[in-house]
Amino acid sequence: MKPDVKICGLKTEEAVEKAVSLGATHVGFIFFEKSPRHIEPDIAGRIAEKARGRAKIVAVTVDADTDDLDDIVYLLKPDILQLHGHESPQQVLTIKALYGLPVMKVFSIREPADLLQIDAYIGIADRFLLDAKAPEGSDLPGGNGVTFDWRLLRDLDAEVDYMLSGGLNKDNVGQALAETAARGLDVSSGVESAPGVKDLERMDQFFAAVRLATATAPVSGSVQ
């Protein structure tokens, strides 16, 4: 089966419609003011209607407090909460109970030890997203356009359901699928002409590359 594909950091109706029409299974909206992809919850809620019922709507937060989460959930009505901060297993459980939504927990990877933290969240988070650790000095936990060594994932338990993120683009996504057991792909900067500006042609190219890769080397997919 084809992998899930999530286009993250969407800010316009045009980009949302394009993502869904190309076959995106997930569309992500980022609520983190330091990011060039940050969007206000009310605006996100309006443009997300283009995707509702056609793709999973994902709210991406970074150590958000309850008041902010309340606003995001109320205005966006997401299908999934993506936690990109330092949320503990107990915090993940609390958030799931509070909002009744599945959680995708993000981990930043650079070296083998970074994968060890996943164990504490198995059976708690509904899915994982494995991203490249941010470069030194970056204010952004993700969306930095850098990859990590995918060979690190070879020893990951095959039962771990994860999306692969970090520097994916049309030129490397085939290699990413060949080298990992990722059941999903998350792309943001790789389909942009500038930080926060989605490029419709690059989105076309990315999906074409995914189709080409999966036609020759199918992977198992999993839609949350």
Curated annotation (Swiss-Prot):
Reaction equations catalysed: N-(5-phospho-beta-D-ribosyl)anthranilate = 1-(2-carboxyphenylamino)-1-deoxy-D-ribulose 5-phosphate
GO MF terms, alphabetically ordered: phosphoribosylanthranilate isomerase activity
Superkingdom: Bacteria
Membrane-spanning intervals of the chain: none
Coiled-coil boundaries: none
Family: Belongs to the TrpF family.
The name this protein goes by in its record: N-(5'-phosphoribosyl)anthranilate isomerase
Organism of this sequence: Allorhizobium ampelinum (strain ATCC BAA-846 / DSM 112012 / S4) (Agrobacterium vitis (strain S4))
Classification of source organism: Bacteria, Pseudomonadati, Pseudomonadota, Alphaproteobacteria, Hyphomicrobiales
